[in-house]
């Protein structure tokens, strides 16, 4: 069986790791970096760029360069968070036929799992290049506060990328695994994982216990905000720059997508610089132009200014920390360690706020960019059976229930229940002779069902006529280890039952996923063909260069007919290389023709080199003979070793 890789599918950056024995290895991508930007660009020639190459061209192709797509995964178009992003993103966010939020590139509608699958495919390829073998299984991380739809959509993305997702694991839990197995502290410990990433925020309270030599990681509680992260911090800087530029120049940059893309890049860079310095300068020449000519942007931003701009965002992370502590049934003073995860936690103001709340310095010895992928790889090793000393007990982040009479949300499974878990409850009909019941499944903490997230609904039909309250309908909720819900309803009188895996009344259908898997496979084959074509072109170019060079040096040693034959074959190869529509077979045929025509030239070069070597060897032999003739008076056997003394002068 191949290795199960661990993937941190992040909003801003992604990372892949594997276990080698008991050592973890974070794998560098083809650009040599340990993290890959979660950016996907769709080019005019149908090529798809992922990671750094996509980021590099984003300024010139803003409408078809997709980033932060994780914020949309498993979300409905109408959700207020999605509506907020529509006005901020340079690319189009559209409403799919099923009501989900999708994106658009080159006029093609794309589901967020389909786009995220491109990043996962890059991670898969990165691991395969390192291991030298195919990879088909993965553990993928999600924010702890992701709901059922978002988890299902992430699983779908894995399938589209050609991966069997062995487990969906919560990011803070993964970071705790990485921390707990890396550090040598003994005894039971309670840790808080504060995870502020590119698009989401999570906090989990986790107890690490040593039970008979087995490390047990039990999540006591989790809380968070799936629409708060580094992207929002960047946006505050962008809004500030736009406001200042409008005051100075009277030009509104918010409607200019090219300018916005440059501003995004500059804002991210400024934010990072201000983590280590007190002031930075944003300098963007030719940001726009009007009738008076080109406009340049030059603005100094101090750390204090940045902190003022994002103060409320940092503050927003503290309430979930309070709730998590309360739900875990512990006091702040019970927390032994605070772990920071996610790139945004490098901001000094965030670290200061965390220290202020928890009353202790957060640990600095955990890599915030890599810990989550490392934890996923450890969980992969546990699932493959190669590691027996780790037990992970995670929780469901939000309460699950059904809508009952009067639109009330009746909770079946409370938040922070350890998973996997199962719960059954008996309900009855609301009307006399009611022949069917509709069961609506919700997730959330509000008292009324309408205030929560509708995950899906289904009918149980064929209930025998009876007065209201008489039929007994048993509803079963079953949450698997991925945090994904399966619901069943059974009429106890007739034994009739109906079961569903909650796929939401949105989400991708099985047929859509299958089609996307096939498209992805077709793209992989197409990519392979393109790479082979590029290799043939490179080979052709190199052959043209080397043959021309050889002709210049040795052409005069060839007969006229031979030289003409080579030149004609070279001309044909150059023509085929200049033609953009030439395929691999055409190029290979002309390469072969040049190689065949150049055989005589190769023979002449070889003969010439041999002659040169023979000449050099003859000259060296003659020189050696001359030397022995001069020293011939003393036969070698009679050489006398001279003794010498060092004479010191006073």
From Swiss-Prot:
Induction of expression: By stress conditions e.g. heat shock.
Segments of this protein annotated with the region Disordered: 611-650
Record keywords: ATP-binding, Chaperone, Nucleotide-binding, Phosphoprotein, Stress response
Superkingdom of the source species: Bacteria
PROSITE patterns documented for this protein: HSP70_1, HSP70_2, HSP70_3
Disulfide partners: none
Low complexity biased stretches: 611-636
Keyword Nucleotide-binding carried by entry: yes
Pfam families reported in the protein's UniProt record: HSP70
Keyword ATP-binding tagged: yes
Positions of modified residues (Phosphothreonine): 200
Coiled coil: none
GO MF, one annotated term: ATP binding
Function: Acts as a chaperone.
HAMAP family in the cross-refs: DnaK
Family: Belongs to the heat shock protein 70 family.
Protein name: Chaperone protein DnaK
């Amino acid at each position: 069986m191949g290795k199960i890789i661990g993937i941190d599918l992040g909003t801003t950056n992604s990372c892949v790791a594997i276990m080698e024995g008991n050592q973890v290895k974070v794998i560098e991508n083809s650009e040599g970096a340990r993290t890959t930007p979660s950016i996907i660009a769709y080019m005019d020639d149908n090529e798809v760029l992922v990671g750094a190459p996509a980021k590099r061209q984003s300024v010139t192709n803003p409408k078809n360069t997709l980033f932060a797509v994780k914020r949309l995964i498993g979300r409905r178009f109408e959700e207020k968070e999605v509506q907020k992003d529509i006005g901020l993103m340079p690319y189009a966010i559209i409403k799919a036929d099923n009501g989900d939020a999708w994106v658009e590139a080159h006029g093609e509608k794309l589901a967020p799992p389909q786009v995220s699958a491109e990043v996962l495919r890059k991670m898969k390829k990165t691991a395969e290049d390192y291991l030298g073998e195919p990879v088909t299984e993965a553990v993928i991380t999600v924010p702890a506060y992701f709901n059922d739809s978002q988890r299902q959509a992430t699983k779908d993305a894995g399938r589209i990328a050609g991966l069997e997702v062995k487990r969906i694991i919560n990011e803070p839990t993964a970071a705790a695994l990485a921390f707990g197995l890396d550090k040598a502290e003994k005894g039971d410990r309670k840790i808080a994982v504060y995870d502020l990433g590119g698009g989401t925020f999570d906090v989990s309270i986790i107890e690490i216990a040593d039970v008979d030599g087995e490390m047990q990681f039990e999540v006591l509680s989790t809380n968070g905000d799936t629409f708060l992260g580094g992207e929002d911090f960047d946006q505050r800087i962008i809004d500030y720059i736009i406001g200042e530029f409008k005051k100075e120049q009277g030009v509104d940059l918010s409607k200019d997508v090219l300018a916005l893309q440059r501003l995004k890049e500059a804002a991210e860079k400024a934010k990072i610089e201000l983590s280590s310095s007190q002031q930075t300068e944003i300098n963007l020449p030719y940001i726009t132009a009007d009738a008076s000519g080109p406009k340049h942007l030059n603005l100094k931003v101090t750390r204090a200014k940045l902190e003022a701009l994002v103060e409320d965002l940092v503050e927003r992370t503290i309430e979930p920390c309070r709730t998590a502590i309360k739900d875990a049934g512990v006091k702040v003073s019970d927390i032994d360690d605070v772990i920071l995860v996610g790139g945004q936690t490098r901001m000094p103001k965030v670290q200061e706020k965390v220290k202020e709340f928890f009353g202790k310095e957060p640990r600095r010895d955990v890599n915030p960019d890599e810990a989550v992928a490392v934890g996923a790889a450890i969980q992969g090793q546990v699932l493959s059976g190669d590691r027996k000393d780790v037990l992970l007990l995670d929780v469901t982040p939000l309460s699950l229930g059904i809508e009952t009479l009067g639109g009330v949300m009746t909770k079946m499974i409370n938040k922070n229940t350890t998973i996997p878990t199962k719960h059954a409850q008996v309900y009855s009909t609301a009307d006399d002779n009611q022949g069917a019941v509709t069961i609506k499944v919700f997730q959330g903490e509000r008292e009324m069902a309408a205030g929560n997230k509708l995950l899906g609904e289904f009918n149980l039909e064929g209930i025998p006529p009876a007065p209201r309250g008489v039929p007994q309908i048993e509803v079963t909720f079953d949450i698997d280890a991925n945090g994904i819900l399966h619901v069943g309803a059974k009429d106890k009188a007739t034994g009739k039952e109906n079961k569903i895996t909650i796929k939401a009344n949105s989400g991708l259908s099985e047929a859509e996923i299958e089609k996307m898997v096939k498209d992805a496979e077709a793209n992989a084959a197409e990519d392979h063909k393109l790479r082979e074509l590029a290799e043939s072109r490179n080979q052709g170019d190199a052959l043209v260069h080397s043959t021309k060079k050889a002709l210049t040096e040795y052409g005069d040693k060839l007969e006229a007919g031979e030289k003409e034959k080579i030149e004609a074959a070279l001309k044909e190869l150059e023509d085929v290389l200049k033609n953009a529509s030439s395929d691999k077979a055409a190029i290979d045929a002309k390469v072969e023709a040049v190689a065949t025509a150049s055989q005589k030239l190769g023979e002449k070069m070889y003969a010439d080199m041999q002659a040169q070597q023979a000449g050099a060897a003859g000259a060296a032999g003659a020189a050696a003979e001359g030397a022995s003739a001069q020293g011939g008076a003393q036969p070698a056997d009679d050489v006398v070793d001279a003794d010498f003394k060092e004479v010191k002068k006073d």
